[in-house]
């Protein structure tokens, strides 16, 4: 069995995977609320006392959470976890930018896209919206923009008259009230952002 995890600013997901690369069990945690008690409670789902863990690998953009999970697994189950950026990734990927400045989540996305044939622009919608560029298995860098939900929540937190809003597609650009106008701004605004950035990257990598 293998444990793999993705520790993000908003959410942490941890998976138990069998020898056929099939997800057996999954844990989801709010990254803002993670503590020792919660980690201990959630990992009971994996029933780790009765199985053998061959490897444990995380990609993490919150070092403190990784350290806490690694400490817990090592103390209670003698399982040592590795963080993606600490591995020798140059054996898989030719990285042409400052390695220390790239998040583990973005590197994981790039590694997942390697196939020796195609070039990729990889989009990831999380706390941040990221674009990463892979050409002939060479990681060229990317773009980081504010995430949709982060921006939407910040707007409602800072603007007194704008309520919490769930993002939905709007058929028309012009909103008829505050809520539909905000939805339109975010839906069409981010659609335009994505189209524009993707097109600019394509031009820059021709």
Residues of each region from the PLM?
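Short beta-strand-loop/turn "lid" adjacent to the catalytic site in phosphate-handling enzymes
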Residues: 50-102, 137-148, 176-191
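Glycine-rich phosphate-binding loop signature in dinucleotide/nucleotide-binding domains
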Residues: 48-52, 116-118, 204-206
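A short, acidic, amphipathic alpha-helical segment used as a generic capping/interface helix at domain edges
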Residues: 190-204
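Acidic-glycine-rich active-site phosphate/pyrophosphate-binding loop
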Residues: 79-91, 127, 161-170
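Conserved phosphate-binding catalytic cores of ATP/NTP-utilizing and phosphoryl-transfer enzymes
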Residues: 90-120
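Gly/Thr-rich phosphate-binding beta-strand-loop-beta motif of the actin/hexokinase/Hsp70
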Residues: 1-24, 113, 118-138, 155
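N-terminal glycine/serine-rich phosphate-binding loop of ATP-dependent small-molecule kinases
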Residues: 1-3, 7-89
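Glycine-rich phosphate-binding loop plus the immediately following alpha-helix
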Residues: 32-35, 112-117, 140-183, 188
């Amino acid at each position: 069995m293998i444990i793999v995890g993705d520790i993000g600013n908003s959410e942490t997901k941890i998976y138990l995977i069998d020898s056929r690369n099939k997800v057996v069990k999954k844990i989801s945690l709010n990254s803002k609320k993670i503590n020792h008690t919660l980690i201990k409670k959630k990992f009971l789902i994996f029933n780790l006392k009765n199985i053998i863990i061959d490897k444990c690998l995380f990609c993490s953009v919150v070092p403190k959470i990784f350290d806490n999970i690694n400490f817990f697994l090592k103390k209670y189950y003698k399982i040592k976890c590795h963080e993606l950026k600490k591995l020798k990734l140059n054996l898989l990927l030719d990285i042409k930018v400052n390695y220390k400045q790239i998040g583990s989540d973005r590197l994981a996305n790039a590694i997942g896209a390697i196939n020796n044939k195609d070039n990729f622009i990889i989009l990831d919608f999380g706390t941040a919206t990221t674009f990463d560029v892979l050409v002939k298995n060479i990681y060229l860098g990317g773009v980081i923009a504010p995430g949709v939900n982060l921006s939407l929540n910040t707007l409602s937190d800072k603007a007194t008259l704008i309520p919490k809003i769930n993002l939905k597609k709007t058929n028309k650009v012009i909103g008829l009230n505050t809520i539909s106008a905000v939805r339109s701004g975010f839906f069409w605004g981010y659609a335009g952002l994505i189209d524009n950035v993707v097109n600019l990257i394509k031009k820059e990598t021709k």
